Curated annotation (Swiss-Prot):
Keywords: Cytoplasm, Methyltransferase, rRNA processing, S-adenosyl-L-methionine, Transferase. Its EC number is 2.1.1.174. This is Ribosomal RNA large subunit methyltransferase G. Belongs to the methyltransferase superfamily. RlmG family. It is found in: Cytoplasm. The keyword Nuclease does not apply. The keyword rRNA processing applies. Its main location: cytoplasm. It comes from Pseudomonas aeruginosa (strain UCBPP-PA14). Specifically methylates the guanine in position 1835 (m2G1835) of 23S rRNA. One of its GO terms (cellular component) is cytoplasm. It comes from the Bacteria. It catalyses: guanosine(1835) in 23S rRNA + S-adenosyl-L-methionine = N(2)-methylguanosine(1835) in 23S rRNA + S-adenosyl-L-homocysteine + H(+).
Length: 374
């Protein structure tokens, strides 16, 4: 892989999770453009720089030896990538302060560098949280590859930060540059809520939660087929989102011990709040993690999963395959993985390579629900 070379550093960077024969780089031309623009603007060791949505740590790691860096994002995988890439390049792990997107990064900041996320609601919430955290004369610069950079991103910068102009495109990347100006204290439209009829739940969703406006159709297909009356099993909702699968299963299985895990901090926060609203003080474990990587081997009896099929702009089944491997390792002998997936993804064949038996629980023209036994 080529080095990431900018006026600040030359770094050897990897993606997270790493894949054998990985063809994709851990940086893009938008990262390079952001750092070149900041270098031209000029920084000193006293400059306080906030980096938002730094997918694999390219921005924060480049800046760490030169300025005071805070990095904030909603991906725990992104946090792990940052730590890995700092260590890989001989940089102090403490040189970058990390703040999950579920919390507010406290300034004041002189410069804010933003990689525009796929979910514009996340960008909106992040810009709202910048209110009161910018130093006088601060600049907020957002960047993305032109094909992934919606006009609405510039509108959000205008609304919440100040006058904005777009740069020329360089290597198919573009900057949106906003000068901080007086703006009234904004009121966030997040979290959102929607009502579920069965089970009867009102579900809260922070800004970056998948399908925050309503239940996704895969989960809707899965809910009527959740196993019930299984006793005191140790179960996990893997990739829990707002927690609906884990909560619905817990309602059907009052003695079950639940762990809800997601790589999104906002998802875990949503799941925790929804659990409390539905189940009060009933104990459960909530964890932002790289799937079940932190789960002890053989410590679960059941895993429920509606696996994702994309990481940022990259589509594929590599994340689902990784979750299936993690579930197999975390399950005790006789344990089961239950999943829902699009028919065309062929999960049945993949699961057969990992588990002793795979059965179809239910299906409709679009989705299939499978259970795989260890």
């Amino acid at each position: 892989m080529p080095l990431f070379a900018t006026p600040f550093a030359q770094l050897d960077l990897v993606r997270q999770p790493e894949q054998d024969g990985e063809p994709l780089q851990a940086f893009d031309a938008a990262d390079e453009y952001l750092l070149n623009q900041l270098h031209e603007r000029g920084v000193t060791a006293q400059c306080r720089v906030l980096v938002l949505n730094d997918a694999f740590g390219a921005l924060a790691a480049s800046l760490a030896p030169h300025v005071q860096v805070t990095s904030s994002g909603d991906s725990h995988l992104g946090f792990l990538a940052l730590r890995k890439n700092l260590a890989r390049n001989g940089l102090d792990l403490g040189s970058v302060r990390f703040v999950p997107a579920s919390e507010t990064a406290v300034g004041p900041f002189d410069h804010v560098l933003v990689k525009v996320p796929k979910t514009l609601a996340l960008l909106e919430e992040q810009l709202i949280r910048l209110h009161g955290q910018l130093a006088p004369g601060a600049q907020v610069v957002a960047a993305g590859m032109v094909k992934h950079l919606p006009r609405a991103a510039g509108d959000l910068l205008e609304r919440y930060i100040g006058p904005m102009h777009a740069s020329l495109a360089v290597k198919k990347a573009r900057l949106l540059i906003a000068e901080a100006a007086e703006r009234p204290q904004p009121r966030s439209p997040y979290p959102t809520r929607y009502r579920l009829e069965q089970p009867p739940l009102t579900l809260l969703n922070h800004a970056n939660v998948f399908c925050r406006e309503g239940l996704d159709i895969g989960t809707r297909a899965f809910l009527p087929h959740l196993p019930r009356s299984l006793g005191a099993l140790r179960a996990a909702d893997l990739g829990c989102g707002n927690g609906v699968l884990g909560i619905a299963y817990a309602l059907l299985n009052p003695q079950a011990e639940l762990t809800l895990v997601d790589e999104s901090y906002m998802a875990v926060q949503s799941a925790r709040e929804n659990w409390r609203a539905a189940l009060g003080e009933r104990p459960a474990t909530f964890r932002a993690d790289d799937g079940l990587a932190g789960q002890a081997a053989g410590s679960l009896d059941l895993v429920l999963c509606n696996p994702p099929f994309h990481q940022q702009q990259v589509v594929g089944d590599f994340l689902a395959w990784r979750m299936f491997l993690q579930a197999r390792d975390a399950l005790a002998a006789g344990g089961e993985l239950w999943i829902v997936g699009n028919r065309h993804l062929g999960y049945h064949a993949k699961l057969k390579r990992l588990f002793r038996g795979v059965e179809q629980v239910a299906a409709n023209p679009k989705f299939v629900i499978l259970k795989a036994g260890k």
